[in-house]
Amino acid sequence: MQPYLLLAVGTGGFVGAILRFLISGWVQRLSPTLFPVGTLSVNVLGSFIIGFLALYFESVVAPHQKALVITGMLGALTTFSTFSLETVTMLQGGLWGRVVTNITLNVFLCVVATMLGMMLFKRLYG
């Protein structure tokens, strides 16, 4: 492993983690619900961006750029572990409706957002 790739992932992760903290906190504060919309929002946003950039990085490939943005920043922005913890916490509280909604929305919306990001890239750049 080349040291500059590790530095790129770490730098991207630093930025992505800060963005996740700010965006998810802001969205959650705006929401009048106990449902984890902050986590959902960063997962959907990150999925849209990764869909768009996946096609970009197919043609403009510098390993450190992909490591910085895809692995580092978007890996830290999106958060499967927090989604899992919030889901388990709802399970333990017997909130079955919220559990099903959380799982369904995260999976469905993230897949759709990735597809929309790819579609936008194709529309803009052919």
UniProtKB/Swiss-Prot annotation:
Disulfide bonds: none annotated. It catalyses: fluoride(in) = fluoride(out). Na(+) binds at residues 75, 78. Keywords: Cell inner membrane, Cell membrane, Ion channel, Ion transport, Membrane, Metal-binding, Sodium, Transmembrane, Transmembrane helix, Transport. It is a multi-pass membrane protein. It is found in: Cell inner membrane. Na(+) is not transported, but it plays an essential structural role and its presence is essential for fluoride channel function. GO terms for molecular function: fluoride channel activity; metal ion binding. GO terms for biological process: cellular detoxification of fluoride. One of its GO terms (cellular component) is plasma membrane. InterPro entries: FluC. The chain crosses the membrane at residues 3-23, 37-57, 68-88, 101-121. Fluoride-specific ion channel. Important for reducing fluoride concentration in the cell, thus reducing its toxicity. Belongs to the fluoride channel Fluc/FEX (TC 1.A.43) family. PANTHER family: FLUORIDE EXPORT PROTEIN 1-RELATED (PTHR28259:SF1). This is Fluoride-specific ion channel FluC. It comes from Sulfurovum sp. (strain NBC37-1). The lineage of its organism: Bacteria, Pseudomonadati, Campylobacterota, Epsilonproteobacteria, Campylobacterales.
